[in-house]
């Protein structure tokens, strides 16, 4: 059976609110860390979310 190519990751807010999103990414095609501008409901504005390892 083949091992899955997708890895679960956590996108954590850089605003320091502790808010996060979970998603998955293909680790073969995107080996670099992801960074998105997403909405943080605790800060009530769009902030940068950086990838951290899901524990």
Swiss-Prot record:
The keyword Ribonucleoprotein applies. Residues 14-24 have a biased composition (Polar residues). The keyword Ribonucleoprotein applies. PROSITE patterns: RIBOSOMAL_L33. Keywords: Ribonucleoprotein, Ribosomal protein. Residues 1-11 have a biased composition (Basic and acidic residues). One of its GO terms (cellular component) is cytosolic large ribosomal subunit. One of its GO terms (molecular function) is structural constituent of ribosome. GO terms for biological process: translation. Residues 1-27 are annotated as: Disordered. Gene3D superfamilies: Ribosomal protein L33. Belongs to the bacterial ribosomal protein bL33 family. HAMAP family: Ribosomal_bL33. This is Large ribosomal subunit protein bL33. It comes from Dechloromonas aromatica (strain RCB).
């Amino acid at each position: 059976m083949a091992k899955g190519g997708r890895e679960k990751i956590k996108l954590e807010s850089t605003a320091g609110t502790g808010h996060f999103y979970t998603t998955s990414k293909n680790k073969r095609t995107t080996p670099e860390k992801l960074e998105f501008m997403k909405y943080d409901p605790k800060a009530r504005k769009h902030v940068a979310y950086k990838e951290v390892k899901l524990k």
